[in-house]
Amino acid sequence: MAEPKESTCGLKQQGLRPGSCRVKTGGKHALACQATLKKEKGKCYRLITSIHLSRPENYLSIYQSGCNFSCRKCHSWYFSKVKDGRWYSPEDILEQSVAYEKIVNLWEPREKATSWHAHDSCRCCGSCILQRKRPDSCPNVLPPESILLSPQGFGPARNIVAFTGGDLTCRPEFYVECARLIKAETRLWVLIETNGYGLNSQNLEDLKESGVDAFWLDIKAFDPEKHKWLTGCSNEHILKLPGEMIKRGFALEVLSLYIPDLVETEELVKIAQRLNEAGPHIPFTILAFFPEHQMKDFRCPTVEEIVDAYHGVKSAGLKNIRIGNVGVFARTQEDQAYLMSHVDKGSF
């Protein structure tokens, strides 16, 4: 299928390559920025699949339909690559944000406007509510009265609103208008979960000016061929983004998947080295892959592989490292004991 025309693609207008941005709609395919983003009477609208207090992030998540990547392992493919949801204007997003602010019970500083820092206050197990007892892993920060039940489980409500799911930051207008309204009318931090592909210098400046506070950057792979195979797109400028984001004063966290036989310790160490150049205290999560979408023939990592990756990343100089999706690779008591004895306390 032909590439988007320059007149319709914001990236091509800036001399850049378009993303892998086609989505299914009515049995056909269309550009995500045309099928899930629109402008009527000068106002932007975005197709939103759902909005709710998410766990374990413990913030208001806005799940977007339509994406400029075609990730083979995407666990959100059924709405990120398929047109799904209802249209929201920036004013509609503000209305949701204002309503959410009324239930916020954990006020974080701007530097903690991330998913990574959610674990500092609550592990979302619900034990203090269901069993009236805190587990040994509890941070012991919050009283039980602060723990709320949401569609995804127990936890607090932090003062953050996040755009997640499909990524169309290559067309920043909607995010810009939403951020301006949210910052003007609430005390919430604005976080964008992103693959980074659309975040060239101009778009970063526009988002900074609008009041966006933080980014959760998924770096899929270091090797350009692996990244292209995984996503359909280049990672050339994505690897430069951590430094560009830090330079502009954004709060930042980075996440990468450990995918056996594809993105393993060597790849993750190279990503960590690049992050360390931007700042050793950037929070970094090693997330265990599980088979999904077009990668169901791939296996999950072992606990030994994850531990090896953890120490490799640590050797690169990063100070804030966490392991995610523990249940994927540490399913037995033996695996859990091995993990606890081989990584630092609080790292998962």
Language model regions located:
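Conserved active-site and cofactor/substrate-binding residues in soluble primary-metabolism enzymes
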Residues: G66-F69, Y88, E173, E266, ...
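Auxiliary Fe-S-binding modules of radical SAM enzymes
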Residues: M1-G19, I246, Y258-F348
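Short, highly selective alpha-helical patches that border small-molecule cofactor pockets
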Residues: K24-G26, Y175, I306
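Conserved AdoMet/S-adenosylmethionine-binding subsite of the radical SAM
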Residues: P139-C300
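Hydrophobic, Leu/Ile/Phe/Ala-enriched alpha-helical segments that form helix-helix packing faces
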Residues: S97-E101, I182, L275, V313
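Residue-level detector of family-conserved "landmark" positions at structurally sensitive sites
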Residues: K81-D84, E193, V254-L255, I323-G324
